[in-house]
Design a protein with these regions (language model features):
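Structural preference for beta-strand elements that scaffold enzyme active sites
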Residues: 42-46
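Alpha-helical scaffold elements lining the catalytic groove of polysaccharide deacetylases
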Residues: 1-39, 53-56
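C-terminal domain-boundary segment and adjacent tail
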Residues: 39, 49-124
Length: 124
């Protein structure tokens, strides 16, 4: 809707907010992973690609690299203990997200990161 309105300033704000959200998400999930496992688990980047996501992907990947992430194969990720119950169907089901593990262990959840601008407030 920003593009349809020709709102270039809001588009730039949206792009910066996109990267801000990704950066804060890195801190949130790394903190949670370290609280639960004492380490970074191999994270999976799942994206539903729209026009903005496609445009931002190079900057997003640069952000991940600058924060020390490496890109590995799904096979390497699945070999980690965290994903064991998702890949070995002989095992009982277990939470497949860090929040689920924290809840199962009765560990308080950290606060969700807050953005400086709510994307829904743009281009109305």
């Amino acid at each position: 809707r920003c593009k349809a309105k020709g709102d270039a300033q809001s588009i730039e704000t949206l792009k910066e907010t996109y990267l801000e959200a990704a950066d804060k998400s890195i801190d949130y999930y790394r903190d949670l992973s370290h609280q639960l496992y004492g380490r970074d688990i191999p994270y999976v980047l799942l994206m539903h690609i729209g026009a903005l996501d496609a445009e931002m992907l190079p900057r997003l990947l640069d952000l991940y690299k600058s924060r020390g992430f490496e890109f590995v194969t799904l096979q390497q990720v699945e070999s980690d203990e965290f994903y064991r119950s998702s890949t070995d169907l002989r095992l009982p089901a277990a939470p497949d997200m860090l929040e689920g593990v924290a809840g199962e262990r009765h560990i308080p959840m950290p606060s969700q990161p807050q953005l400086s601008v709510e994307p829904e407030s743009l281009c109305k």
